[in-house]
From Swiss-Prot:
NCBIfam families with a match to the protein in the record: hisS (TIGR00442)
GO biological process terms on file: histidyl-tRNA aminoacylation
Assembly with partners or alone: Homodimer.
Subcellular location field: Cytoplasm
GO cellular component: cytoplasm
Classification lineage: Bacteria, Bacillati, Mycoplasmatota, Mycoplasmoidales, Metamycoplasmataceae
UniProt name for this protein: Histidine--tRNA ligase
EC code: 6.1.1.21
Highest taxon above the source species: Bacteria
Record organism: Mesomycoplasma hyopneumoniae (strain J / ATCC 25934 / NCTC 10110)
Gene: hisS
Record InterPro entries: aa-tRNA-synth_II, aa-tRNA-synth_II/BPL/LPL, Anticodon-bd_dom_sf, His-tRNA-ligase, HisRS-like_core, HisRS/HisZ
Primary location class: cytoplasm
UniProt keywords, alphabetically: Aminoacyl-tRNA synthetase, ATP-binding, Cytoplasm, Ligase, Nucleotide-binding, Protein biosynthesis
One annotated GO molecular function: ATP binding
The UniProt record lists the keyword Cytoplasm: yes
Length: 428
C-alpha cells in the first residue's frame, strides 16, 4: 500500500498558525531566561554515535525500546538523540569544558519511537539546563537555582497550575541495596504485574514505581520506600534541601516513589506536574535531578552535575488553551493601487521596519474595494494608502478598527506618534 505523500510521519507534526506563534514566543522566553541566569547556549548534533546512549542508559525504555538507530554507509551505528544530557556530557569531555563549574542551556528536537498520544510525540522539542562540575557542598544551592529558574520561566509563560514533587535516590551503593529489596518485594506479586514489569524486576525494579499502570495498584503503593534505606548523611542532605526550599517559600510534595526515566539519575530528583487538566492527565512539564554517575561514562570522575528538561509541546498545549493569547497582528499594511505606489510603499516599508514596526504590503495593484478587503484580512491595525488628488508628500493613514482617516507627511514620518497610536489600539 502506497504511503500518501501529503501526510507527515506518525508521531510528528507541522508547526503553523497559532501553534507556530506560541512556539516562537516560548523559545524566546527560554533564551531570555537562560541569559538572565547566565546559562551558555550549547548545540549538539541531532544524531550521535549510538553507544553514547547505549552505555549511559542501558536498561532505560528510551534506549531498549524507543531509540532510533541506524547504520551509515561506512557501517557506523548512529542514533537520533532521545535526550540532551548525554550528548552535552560527551561534548564537555571532548572539548575539555570541565576546568570550572559550567552552566549550559539547549533547545532542540529529540526523537523517541513511542506510542504517540496527547503531549507525547516521536519528534518533540526539549529545553534543558545543565550545571556541571559543581562543588559537592553546594548541592542545595544548585537545586535552589534550578527550581527558581523553572518558576521564573513558568511566570514568564503565564503558567501557574503545577505541583513540585521531589525525592532523594541516594548514591549508587544505597540505591543498589534498595533495588535488591524492591526486586524481592515485587517477586511476591509477579503474577499481578504487567508483562514489561516482570522483566523490570530483574533489570530495573525502580521503573515499576514509575509505570502509569502499576502506580495505581495497591501493592505498588505499599512497596518499600527509598527513605528507609537512607544513611544519616542522606537524611542531612535531604533536610538541607527541604529547608532551603521552605526558606524561599517554595511549595513541594515528597514522593518516595518518584524516579526518573533515565538510568543515570541519583541523589535529588524532581518533577513539576501539570495540575490544570489541560493535558487530560497529570503529566510532567519539566523534570530532572542529579546525575553524578553519568560523567564517569565519559572518563570524568568526581564530577557533580544537575540538570532538567522541559517538554515544549506540553507547554504549547497549555498555552493554546488559555483565552488571553494575543495574535501578533501587523501594525501597518501599505496599500497600493498602482505600480508607482508600490515602489513608494516599498521605500516606506523599509523605513518603518527599520523602526521595528510590523509591516506588509501588496505587490500587485488592486482596486480600492479589493485593496481594503486585503488590508483587513491581513490583521493590520492601520493601513497606509495614497488617495486621488492627495496633497504632495502626504499619505493617508486609516485606523481599521475605528475608521478614522488622517493625513501623514510622507517625507517626515513621526515615529513617536505612530508608536502612540499602535499602543492606543492595543489597549482599546
Amino acid at each position: 500500500m502506497k504511503k500518501k505523500l501529503n501526510l507527515c510521519p506518525k508521531g510528528t507534526y507541522d508547526f503553523f498558525g497559532q501553534g507556530a506563534k506560541i512556539f516562537i514566543d516560548v523559545r524566546k522566553v527560554f533564551f531570555n531566561q537562560a541569559k538572565k541566569f547566565n546559562f551558555s547556549y550549547i548545540e549538539t548534533p541531532i544524531f550521535e554515535y549510538a553507544n553514547i546512549f547505549l552505555t549511559t542508559n542501558q536498561i532505560a525504555d528510551i534506549v531498549s525500546k524507543e531509540l532510533y538507530k541506524f547504520f551509515d554507509k561506512s557501517g557506523r551505528e548512529l542514533a537520533l538523540r532521545p535526550e540532551g544530557t548525554a550528548p552535552i556530557m560527551r561534548s564537555v569531555a571532548q572539548h575539555k569544558l570541565f576546568q570550572t563549574e559550567k552552566k549550559f542551556f539547549y533547545f532542540g528536537p529529540m526523537f523517541r519511537y513511542e506510542n504517540p498520544q496527547k503531549g507525547r510525540f516521536r519528534q518533540f522539542y526539549q529545553a534543558g539546563f545543565e550545571i556541571i562540575n559543581y562543588k559537592k557542598d553546594s548541592l542545595e544551592f544548585q537545586i535552589l537555582e534550578i527550581i527558581l529558574l523553572i518558576k521564573s520561566i513558568f511566570k514568564d509563560l503565564g503558567i501557574n497550575e503545577y505541583e513540585l514533587k521531589i525525592n532523594f535516590l541516594s548514591n549508587l551503593t544505597t540505591r543498589n541495596i534498595y533495588e535488591k529489596n524492591l526486586a524481592q518485594y515485587f517477586e511476591k506479586f509477579s503474577d499481578k504485574l504487567e508483562p514489561i514489569s516482570k522483566i523490570r524486576i530483574k533489570k530495573n525494579p525502580l521503573r515499576i514505581l514509575d509505570d502509569k499502570i502499576e502506580q495505581e495498584k495497591e501493592f505498588v503503593k505499599l512497596a518499600p520506600k527509598i527513605n528507609t534505606f537512607w544513611t544519616m548523611e542522606d537524611k542531612n542532605i535531604f533536610n538541607r534541601i527541604t529547608s532551603i526550599l521552605e526558606e524561599f517559600k517554595i511549595s513541594y510534595k515528597v514522593d518516595y516513589n518518584l524516579v526518573r526515566g533515565l538510568d543515570y539519575y541519583d541523589d535529588f530528583v524532581f518533577e513539576f506536574i501539570d495540575t490544570s487538566q489541560t493535558l487530560g492527565t497529570k503529566l510532567a512539564l519539566v523534570g530532572g535531578g542529579c546525575y553524578n554517575n553519568l560523567p564517569t561514562k565519559f572518563g570524568l570522575n568526581n564530577f557533580k552535575s544537575i540538570g532538567m528538561a522541559f517538554g515544549i509541546e506540553r507547554l504549547i498545549e497549555i498555552l493554546k488553551s488559555k483565552k488571553n493569547i494575543k495574535e501578533q497582528n501587523l501594525d501597518f499594511f501599505l496599500l497600493s493601487f498602482t505600480d508607482k505606489e508600490i515602489l513608494l510603499n516599498f521605500k516606506l516599508a523599509k523605513i518603518l521596519r527599520k523602526e521595528n514596526f510590523l509591516v506588509d504590503l501588496n505587490k500587485t495593484p488592486f482596486s480600492v474595494s479589493k485593496g481594503f478587503q486585503l488590508a483587513k484580512k491581513s490583521g493590520a491595525k492601520f493601513v497606509f494608502f495614497f488617495e486621488k488628488n492627495q496633497a504632495k508628500n502626504y499619505i493617508s493613514l486609516k485606523n481599521l478598527q475605528t475608521g478614522k482617516n488622517e493625513q501623514i507627511l510622507y517625507t517626515e514620518i513621526n515615529f513617536e506618534y505612530l508608536n502612540s497610536i499602535i499602543k492606543a489600539s492595543e489597549n482599546a
